[in-house]
Amino acid sequence: MTELSRARYAELFGPTTGDRIRLADTDLLIEITEDRSGGPGLAGDEAVFGGGKVLRESMGQGRATRAEGAPDTVITGVVVVDHWGIIKADVGIRDGRIVALGKAGNPDTMSGVHPDLVVGPSTEIIAGNGKILTAGGIDCHVHFICPQIMDEALGGGITTMIGGGTGPAEGSKATTVTPGSWHTARMLEALDGWPMNIALLGKGNTVSSESMWEQLRGGVSGFKLHEDWGSTPAAIDACLTVADAAGVQVALHSDTLNEAGFVEDTLAAIAGRAIHAYHTEGAGGGHAPDIITVAAHANVLPSSTNPTRPHTVNTLDEHLDMLMVCHHLSPKIPEDLAFAESRIRPSTIAAEDLLHDLGAISMIGSDSQAMGRIGEVVLRTWQTAHVMKRRRGFLAGDNGADNQRVQRYVAKYTICPAVAHGLEAEIGSVEVGKLADLVLWDPAFFGVRPHAVIKGGMIAWAAMGDANASIPTPQPVLPRPMFGAAPKAAAATSVHFVAPHALEDGLADRLDLSRRLVPVANVRSRGKSDMPRNDAQPRIEVDPDTFTVRIDGDVWEEQPAAELPMAQRYFLF
């Protein structure tokens, strides 16, 4: 019997059980814990496409028709990185959903073929060998300021956006709110043809319950409370009362100036109810200087945004001007300047790094064009993980590879926001039954630029060379829209998430939309313990005079990074 060395096997079929892979140019390594597509015990008839290879008629390709259950697409021999594990598998897609992770091929000629991965004449093949597959990213903090953010997001591995806005209006530039049923209807129509799942947030800054119910019937998926509209205790309580009755989530950007109360007053108004705390961080806004302490509470689902990810020597310098623009402030007004400066605290920005590494801050979003960069959600997440690896070493349970840390960080922009907003039945992980919103990465470019973005089973975005070239690879190779980004295909492979009451009220009949409307579900019972790998509740204290942060009694010292991976080695600008 012919034997292959591990190195030769990896060259032919991709790495297998026990092999380790470096993520981009970071210090992070992953180790494959299981190979369902081949490797030890299954080597010899891996599903590989190409001239002289396995997936040919009467060899790896069988006779099964689509009507008999053949998958529409199989991604072969790919390393799946998800919150639940790091394995290698062939991944099957049918009707836009994941149907199996196992071994693909022809059971007439091959052993161990998964019954839902029988390759037939109707099956397309995407070669995942030597590549990494993650769930499509979920940006849980989006300002819909301009439509071009869709291109940037897709090019960064994002397939779902949660947020609000109506365009470059001052309210939208500041507050991630789509206010009122008219604006909501127009935005749902405008976003119908993009290869992106959408969950709009309505305005929760009101004590008028009817105005909130009106927005729910109009198609929002939940509410946003923002200090620029007045995040008072009364508004918080009123919004959460409606949210509890409607079964939707509330995202909160609290009161930086402490005008209507302090962080303790906001927590009292929340009264133990589930809430997504935006900007649980060092510079994004919310009660100064101690909004970060809410990450210790069991009912609070905390997120932070990417402009402070990770803490570097340049973080503070860029924030003041960004803040003045985003929140319609004037440097000529002393009070505006003081407001801005109160939000930018190096000690709490530094603590944000550690709280992410502990799993105490559960999610990362962009805050797109409102201090954050929508194309860098995934990239900034992995830069943070790298910085923490360098400073803190391996996490408990890791030894020689960083599987625990990697599974924690990938959850921050996939399953955790899906759970927080009631979307996890449809998206958020690489699991059977979910939409095939998937991102394929070359390991050398992991987190930097995807090899391909698959939306609802169809390639929507990909690294592609000159279209007039004789082959697909000649330079310039750029992230480009593919056929899955065409409006009708995009609508067929994407969804709008809405409140259940919108469907009960006949929204689908009132609006001429091409895509499915899907109700959010199982939201109000969620808590920190439901955040996979990100459920820590350490004791957090902030000194009101020095802003020193103590986590479980220990001071976390500022050590801003002077150099990062995934940066100038990959980008000219």
Curated annotation (Swiss-Prot):
The keyword Plastid does not apply. Binds 2 nickel ions per subunit. Pathway: Nitrogen metabolism; urea degradation; CO(2) and NH(3) from urea (urease route): step 1/1. One of its GO terms (biological process) is urea catabolic process. Its cofactor is Ni cation. CDD domains: Urease_alpha. The modification N6-carboxylysine is found at K224. PANTHER family: UREASE. This is Urease subunit alpha. The lineage of its organism: Bacteria, Bacillati, Actinomycetota, Actinomycetes, Mycobacteriales. The gene is ureC.
